[in-house]
Design a protein with these regions (language model features):
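Acidic/histidine-rich alpha-helical segments that form the ligand environment
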Residues: 64-119
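Acidic side chains
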Residues: 16, 46, 104-106
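Short amphipathic alpha-helical segments with heptad-repeat character
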Residues: 2-5, 9, 35, 42, ...
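Disorder-to-helix initiation segments
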Residues: 1-11, 69-76
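Long, well-ordered alpha-helical segments
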Residues: 4-22, 48-51, 83-90, 112-122
Length: 123
């Protein structure tokens, strides 16, 4: 959970960084999609972490690498693809198998795919 929570909380900041720097063809739709992502992800992750901590105790967030400053749409889409792969792997943790935790993770995956859809198709 520590790695998953850290990655997702960092993704909010990364999406905000992409949001303020995106330009070119498709920038307006990307700008809006990224804003929706960073406005939404924090609340979902907060609920997931609080539920987990209610069951297992407090977690310690892990270090995450710095911000990606490449604001090209293709790079932003690749970033979300990497997040989807990471979440798919990290959600397999034995302590995350309770249905209420998996439901929150499902909501995170839904948000990731919605954001990717908007980045790819609404240019």
């Amino acid at each position: 959970m520590e790695q998953l929570a850290s990655l997702l909380l960092h993704s909010r900041t990364q999406a905000h960084s992409f949001h303020v720097g995106v330009k070119g063809v498709g920038a307006l739709s990307a700008h809006q999609a990224l804003q929706h992502y960073y406005d939404t992800i924090g609340g979902i992750v907060d609920g997931l972490v609080e539920a987990y901590q209610g069951q297992y105790g407090l977690i310690k967030l892990q270090p995450v690498s710095g911000l990606d400053t490449n604001n090209d749409i293709k790079n932003i889409i690749a970033y979300f693809d990497k997040l989807l792969v990471a979440v798919a792997k990290l959600r397999e943790d034995k302590k995350l198998q309770m249905s209420w935790l998996q439901n929150d993770i499902d909501n995170i995956v839904t948000l990731l795919y919605q954001t990717k859809y908007k980045l790819v198709n609404l240019q």
